[in-house]
Each structure stands twice: as C-alpha cells, then as structure tokens.
Amino acid sequence: VGWKEDFNMAVRCPVPSQESAYRYADSILDRTERFLSAKKSPDIMIGGHSKGGNMAVYAAMQITQSDIEATNERAQRLGLLPALGGSVPGRNCRISRIFSHDGPGMSQVMVHSRAYQAIAARIDKTVPESSIIGMLLQSQIKPTFVKADAISILQHMGSSWQVTQSGEFEQASELTGGAQLIGKTIDGWFDRVSQEQRERAINQIYDIFAAAGYGNIADLVAHWTDSLPKIVAAARGTDVQTRELIK
C-alpha cells in the first residue's frame, strides 16, 4: 500500500485499493436501498482526488461489469443474444456522476471495455493546467482544465486550484506546453518498452521516490525542497532508460 501501490497502478489492474473502492461503493448501493422512495432508490455520486479518482472510476466500472454479467445471464436463460453496446441496465444506473480530480486513467484494454464505455459519459475529469498525474494512462474523457497558482507537479495539490467568486473552478483553455511535453514523453516511453521493462522501471522509480522519506505524493510535494535533492541523488543509481524518463 502507499507509494508501491501508486506506482503499480501504472502496470497492474486491479490493485488492492481499487478492489476496496469497488467493495465500498457496492456496499453504499446496498445500504441506500433502505431509503427507497415511492418509485426508485436514490442516486449517488462517487469521486476522489489523485489515486482516489482512479479508484472511483474503477469502482463504477466493476459495478457496471456485474450488471453486464447479470444481464447476459438473463439473456442466456431466455435464449436471447447478449447486448454488445450501449447503456447497461442495473444498479450502475444509480451512479449519476463519477468525479476524478487529477486522477490517472486506465490501460487501453480497460477504457475500451464495455463497462468503461457505459459509464464514460458520467465521468467528470478535472485536472490543473500543468497536470502530470491526471494525464497518465488513458481515459478518452476530455478533462476540464483548472488554473492553479503553483508550478508543474506542485499543481497536483488541490489547494492550489483557483476558484471563482461563484464557487466554480476557474477554467484554463488547455494544458501548458510543459505538461503536454511531459505527457507525450511518458506515453511514448510506455509505447516503446515491453511490460517487463515497464515493471522494472516502475520498481526503480518507486525506490527513488521512497528514498525521499515521504509516504505519499501529497507529503512529497508539500516538502519538495527537502525531497527533490534526495530524489535526484537516488536517480543517479538507476539505468539510463529510467533516468531519461525521470528527466
């Protein structure tokens, strides 16, 4: 858990926290059944920041996948062909919105799955204008860009996001040039290397960030003047490919 799992999310799915998020969201749907109105159960909204945003999307996907499997089983019993696309009837329909605030995406396999496509229109993805974390992996969701008063990776801290007098996020038009370059570099690296190379590099990057002595990215960013020199020193001991990625 912690740093190790954060980095494992880049090469594995699911990780334990994603499964925990699914069980929790599923239990909320169960518990709110008792608040039945005259005709329907109440809708819910789920979401989170950073890894929490990814976990919220995963939880909604798994609830939807359970509905897909139940629908296919009913179709099979009735001798009907299973539906291949479109909305999925079931408990997932009670999830009205899924918020991912600077949360990383999913693998290509996941975002092309029927479960993901069924919930995609309900995902509200918000990232700061210099986002790095939130632009990792795939999402197929056009995010809302938010102005922030920090620089680069420090914008991951939600406290730097600007809010208008009416209480809405102050929107930016697009990612900064620097964030776009970093995103293209990381995506290009993932496309070039094998799964084995990715896992080895992820393990090395984990060791580098762990050397800073902080348990999560929020603490590392908050104490960047202390953590950055330690990260640079630890990076010198990695292989060339990993050093190039960090640069």
Set out the residue ranges of the language-model regions:
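Alpha/beta hydrolase fold serine-hydrolase catalytic domain that processes acyl esters and thioesters
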Residues: V1-D43, M61-K247
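Gly/Ala-rich beta-loop-alpha elbow adjacent to hydrolase catalytic centers
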Residues: G48-G52, A56
